[in-house]
Amino acid sequence: MKEEHATCGRISPKEKLQELVTSPRPHEYLDVNALPETWDWRNINGTNYLSWSRNQHIPTYCGSCWAHGPTSSLADRINIVRNRTWPDMTLSPQVIVNCQAGGSCNGGNPAEVYVYANRHGIPEETCQAYVAKNPDHFSCSDIQ
């Protein structure tokens, strides 16, 4: 991979990850005793708000769980805010593998995915389908 593509969105090891909280967190304002005993976003009055499960090793082996977890988590939050309206939100972990440079098919840092999302956004899966491999050549400016 060319150097110009290798640093696309990557956080320097010297740069400290900062907290990106912009609103009060639930534990700061909720009374824990008022919470229900159980809660499952897969079944809220018959509605499943969570994104579908994916296999990071299809079509080939790729250790990209570090990209799949955060993109699914963010997509779930979008589906919840949108009250699961169609179309379902599915964010592209392949863009993260291609651009974020906080990892590859050999592993990575999920915390950097959230920083990348905050700085650049993450497009939907239709922008860059998951191919389970490191890019041979890919320009992140193609998707932004």
Regions found by a protein language model. Give the residues of each.
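Catalytic-core signature of thiol
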Residues: 1-144
